[in-house]
Amino acid sequence: MEINGISGVGMSTAFPLEKNTSSTSVADGAGKFFKELVGKVNDLSQQSDQAIQKLATGENRNLHETMIAVEKASVSFLFMSQVRNKALEAYQEVMRMPV
């Protein structure tokens, strides 16, 4: 009786590795993430400012739409600051690790 080893489940085909021509590191990915996050928060802030200006000039008479835009900008900024704080805490924790 021949005993064969357990064959692979095929995980390499289930989760193929991305083949990039340029080598990207985790730091590059994190930098790209934060850059996109700041850009989106900035866009929401600008939309909020535009909504306030339109309400003040009478171009837009819907106060609720303006308040929604302002709250979106506020919540997105708070989210961004919390993500920043968590990333900074993680960095500080890594720096405290003994070598």
From Swiss-Prot:
Primary location class: other
Subcellular location as annotated: Bacterial flagellum basal body
The superkingdom listed in its UniProt entry is: Bacteria
One biological process GO term for this chain?
A: bacterial-type flagellum-dependent cell motility
Which keywords does this chain's UniProt record carry? Answer: Bacterial flagellum
Provide one Gene Ontology cellular component: bacterial-type flagellum basal body
Annotated Gene Ontology MF terms? Answer: cytoskeletal motor activity; structural molecule activity
Task: List the PANTHER family.
Answer: FLAGELLAR HOOK-BASAL BODY COMPLEX PROTEIN FLIE, PTHR34653
Q: Which family does it belong to?
A: Belongs to the FliE family.
Protein name per the record: Flagellar hook-basal body complex protein FliE
Q: What is the lineage of its organism?
A: Bacteria, Pseudomonadati, Thermodesulfobacteriota, Desulfuromonadia, Geobacterales
Q: Which gene encodes it?
A: fliE
